Design a protein with these regions (language model features):
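The feature marks proteins involved in alpha-glucan
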Residues: 26-54, 97, 104-183, 211-214, ...
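Loop/helix patches that line or flank the sugar-binding groove of alpha-linked glycan CAZymes
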Residues: 659-859, 864-883
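Substrate-binding/active-site clefts of carbohydrate-active enzymes
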Residues: 312-333, 344-512, 520-541, 545, ...
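Short proline/glycine-enriched turn/loop motifs at strand-loop junctions of beta-rich domains
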Residues: 69-75, 189-195, 236, 865-867
């Protein structure tokens, strides 16, 4: 049974702000000193050693919490104190609490959603909601016996309460620093803070706060929203600022944290201070920004073909770029460089979008004084010298992919020519966008809202030092979940969702970003992503295309906390997810393979038809069955991974793709073709060339490896859905077998847009992610002299890729935008003999007369068998078929490095009797005479 009691004088105590004691406050000059210390923290009152720090209870709303209290408890109380000084030792009396509020066990209501399912126990309720000031101090839930002794006690996860008590009034608040009518307004959401001061630095633009004076201005809180504000009757653009936040940090104490603004629009170098910016200021805009227009190349998702690119990779080693701009945003503004000529050629062929790896302010690259390691004199193709040199400086060097968010709304400073100039960062980023638009390419951003680089009191933690325990997803003990790699954010929390959505709006509206790729999107709620879609569309007046990694894992797996933005769950939303079905079937094995698993072969890499040494002794019947299974998943991918598209499986049985199996789940999982992203390579894991280097037989010659690369690219470009290519995939890019080059420096991430040089064989890949696979990698790298792609090999793949891009651009049959159109037009044909040959037919005669593909007919064949294959397809008989006109330049005799030729292509035929013949390791696209004339 639960007892109730009130502490005498409770009403009077609640009327005073918790933590408002004057003795806790240092003098103003001391606060100025804290202002001048980046990520400074002063403990005002230490955490009591007798106060439990874990948080095994969770607020459901502002009145109810869930906790597994001991069954023998006579009463359960909420203990409150202005500082973390509560003494709750098991077997002793509860002490140090300024207030005790009775909690009553109540039936578990139906509205306790999945968000709190990670915390077990019963539901307890207060009689009345706490006043706003109660959330500013320390609190415990305590179970007492009949004599008032502590049986158990724990901290309480606070997000549910803050969402109920403050978020309704705060969700529409304008946060950050804004200039309105000559007045600069600062706003920060921090409902658990007991005091906040604004640090306003006297001089703009300086890197070192210590060099100038600072004003400390008290901010005022709105009790309903928890938003702290301060207005200055002046236009403060260019001025640096920070906040001093007095807040209780579990396990640490009442702390004064010096933090930057999570809603910063500008920063100085290394994110020491936030900078007041107006994104409409001409100083933030390159010349011609007002007239910038995105290319009108994409009407729907399926028109998109994306090239995934890292800003530094693009130009760091391009000697045609001015030295000061190499590795910078401004490299894209030089149209006559090797990189821009290459991108423009891809755009002319049909590439629609560049997707940039993270470009927000990231935590892992010094924006000043980064170092670049020298290549050791003894570095060789198969030794560890180069990776050791990189490893010695990798935490201080100039390279990282950037999946380490620090501030979400500010361009990364290491890509700017002067990271201390906040307006310049913005101007140079916009100049990059403008230059890509002028080259015929839309611009997408890879965004990472699923985690931050640090949490808690870490130096590069921001959110958790302002509202501890709110912005990050917690486990059953109250520790931050890290399944993404780092500190998982809780986008199911109202104000974290607000931050994510408003951040995306800033990039789409103010930087004219055309699409977004969401890293680990499955860790975000579907509802938040739908709200984000509505917000970016409304802010820009156009459709902003969203796609992301819909992987299902971690603490949110299978909807444990909410309906995820994951594969299958997003059906019907128009938000696309990457598909691993065709990717794994084509490459062999699974993403992240290590050791002997790197020899597992797939449809592209020699399964059954070209066994490598590890697979040479396997029974042919076994490998043929595996190839049939892989080929079934190839058809799944080519058909857009649609749930209800029907074709034959590995056993020849006609069934919907939802009944094809991929691991433990369905292979087909989307409801519309625009909801799937097809790829065979991206920044993660081995490049396609490197994967094939490990999986194909070692004696496979380079010209055959080039043909396999073309087949891998063809799978992407002939498939229904969104096409996705990794930068350099069209040039046989290698990372010298590095499976995870996020922190491997410039050398392993090298790309040469002319194709003349390759990173293959520069050395064993870095030990920190690859050493367990060195025994499998070393023999391959030892043959670098014969396996390193040559200029002619890269050119062959590049010209083939551009031809396939042109075919996709010109053929609406390859970009069908509805499930009904795909179901009506596409069919696959069974082939004679062994698997290894895929024949697809697209017949536009089945489409409505108003459809742009109506009446057109197209067939394609993909042969992964090294031998010539032929098959009779009765339904293709009775027509005059010809190879697609865009393939003719590749058929011509002769050839050179600049204009390579495919000597086998002329042998690809589809005759009027329906007899199709295609050379080994080849792709061909055929159209009818009538289609050609249209």
């Amino acid at each position: 049974m639960a007892a109730r009691f009130l502490l005498l004088g409770l009403a009077a105590v609640l009327a005073a702000p918790l933590g408002a004691q004057a003795s806790d406050r240092p003098a103003a000059d001391a606060r100025s000193q804290v202002c001048a210390t980046h990520a400074g923290a002063t403990v005002l009152a230490a955490w009591s050693p007798a106060m439990p720090a874990p948080q095994r209870a969770a607020w459901i709303d502002a009145k109810r919490l869930r906790w597994a209290a001991p069954a023998t408890a006579e009463s359960v109380v909420l203990a409150l104190a202005p500082t973390p000084s509560i003494v709750a030792r098991e077997g002793a009396a509860l002490d140090g609490a300024a207030q005790r509020l009775a909690l009553t066990r109540v039936p578990s209501p139906g509205d306790v959603d999945r968000r709190f399912s990670h915390v077990a126990g019963d539901v307890f309720a207060l009689d009345a909601a706490l006043p706003a000031t109660a959330w500013q101090g320390a609190m415990l839930v305590v179970a007492l016996d009949a004599e008032g002794r502590v049986l158990d006690a724990t901290g309480i996860q606070i997000a549910g309460a803050l969402d109920a008590a403050f978020a309704p009034a705060a969700r529409d608040a304008a946060l950050g620093a804004r200039i309105e009518g000559g007045i600069t307004r600062f706003a920060l959401w921090a409902p658990t803070a007991s005091k906040i001061d604004l640090c306003l630095f006297d001089a703009p633009g300086e890197a070192a706060a210590e060099a100038t004076g600072v004003q400390v201005r008290a901010m005022t809180v709105d009790a309903a929203s928890g938003v702290w504000t301060h207005a200055v009757d002046a236009d403060l653009r260019g001025r640096r600022y920070a906040f001093l936040v007095d807040v209780v940090v579990p396990g640490v104490g009442l702390v004064r944290n010096r933090v930057t603004d999570p809603y910063s629009l500008g920063l100085n170098a290394d994110s020491r201070e936030s900078v007041v910016l107006d994104l409409d200021d001409p100083a933030t805009q390159p010349k011609g920004w007002a007239s910038d227009r995105r290319p009108d190349t994409v009407q729907g998702h399926t028109d998109m073909v994306i090239h995934e690119l890292h800003v530094r990779d693009f130009s760091r080693d391009d000697a045609t770029v001015p030295e000061a701009h190499r590795g910078k945003y401004l490299a894209f503004t030089h149209p006559d460089t090797a990189g821009m000529r290459h991108l423009r050629a891809l755009a002319d062929a049909g590439l629609t979008d560049i997707h940039l790896l993270p470009t927000y302010d990231l935590a892992t690259v010094p924006e000043r004084d980064c170092v670049s390691p020298r290549r050791p004199a003894d570095a060789a193709a198969a030794n560890d010298a180069l990776q050791a040199a990189i490893g010695a400086v990798r935490e201080r060097d100039c390279y990282n992919w950037g999946y380490d968010p620090w501030h979400f709304d500010v361009p990364e400073g290491s890509y700017a020519t002067n990271p201390d100039d906040a307006a310049l960062r913005v101007r140079e980023f916009r100049a990059m966008v403008q230059a890509l638009h002028a080259a015929g390419l839309r611009v997408g951003l890879d965004v990472v809202y699923n985690h931050t680089f640090e949490s808690g009191q870490g130096r590069q933690s921001v959110l958790d030092r302002i509202v501890p325990g709110y912005y990050h997803r917690l486990n059953a003990e109250g520790a931050v979940e890290t399944s993404t790699c780092c500190a998982n954010t809780a986008t199911e929390a109202t104000m974290m969702a607000k931050l994510m959505i408003e951040s995306a709006v800033i990039w789409a509206r103010d930087y004219r970003i055309d699409s977004f790729r969401f890293d680990l999107m499955g860790h975000q709620p579907k509802a938040a992503m739908l709200e984000l879609q509505r917000a970016v569309d409304a802010a820009t007046g156009r459709r902003i295309h969203l796609l992301g990694e819909g992987w299902n894992f971690g603490e949110v797996q299978n909807g444990a906390r909410f309906a995820q933005a994951a594969q299958g769950v997003l059906n019907g939303t128009g938000i696309a997810t990457f598909s691993d079905r065709m990717r794994d079937a084509a490459r062999g094995g699974r993403a992240g393979d290590r050791g002997e698993a790197l020899h597992a072969q797939g449809w592209l890499s020699g399964l059954h038809h070209a066994p490598n040494a590890a697979n040479a002794g396997r029974p042919r019947a076994e490998t043929e069955a595996e190839l049939r299974q892989a080929e079934a998943l190839i058809r799944v991918g080519l058909a857009g991974t649609l749930v209800d598209f029907e074709t034959f499986d590995a056993d020849g049985v006609i069934k919907p793709l939802s009944e094809f199996r991929y691991g433990d789940g369905p292979a087909g999982y989307v409801s519309q073709p625009g909801e799937v992203v097809n790829y065979t390579e991206n920044h993660d894991n081995l490049t396609l060339f490197d994967s094939n280097a490990l999986r194909l037989p070692l004696d496979t010659p380079l010209h055959e490896r080039a043909r396999v690369q073309v087949l891998g690219n063809a799978l992407v470009l002939l498939a229904q859905g969104v096409g996705y290519l990794h930068a350099g995939q069209e040039l046989m890019r290698s990372k010298s077998l590095d499976r995870n080059s996020f922190n491997s420096g410039d050398a392993f991430n090298f790309v040469d847009w002319t194709g003349a040089r390759s990173a293959f064989g520069i050395g064993l890949p870095p030990a920190w992610d690859n050493e367990d696979s060195w025994p499998q990698m070393r023999p391959v790298l030892e043959r670098a002299a014969e396996l390193t792609p040559r200029a002619e090999d890269a050119a062959f793949v590049n010209e083939w890729t551009k031809a396939l891009l042109r075919i996709r651009r010109d053929e609406p049959l390859l970009r069908l935008d509805t499930r009904d159109a795909v179901r009506a037009a596409l069919r696959f044909h069974a082939v004679d003999g062994e698997p290894g040959l895929v024949i697809g037919e697209l017949d536009g005669r089945a489409l409505p007369p108003t459809h742009p593909a109506h009446g057109r007919r197209l067939a394609y064949a993909l042969n992964t068998d090294p031998r010539t294959r032929s098959s009779l397809v009765a339904t293709l008989a009775g027509e005059t078929w010809t190879r697609h006109p865009e393939l003719r330049p590749l058929e011509a005799t002769g050839g050179s490095v600049e204009a390579p030729r495919d000597a086998r292509l002329g042998d690809a035929r589809l005759d009027a009797n329906g007899r199709l013949s295609i050379p080994g390791r080849s792709v061909a696209v055929f159209v009818t005479d009538d289609t050609f004339r249209r």
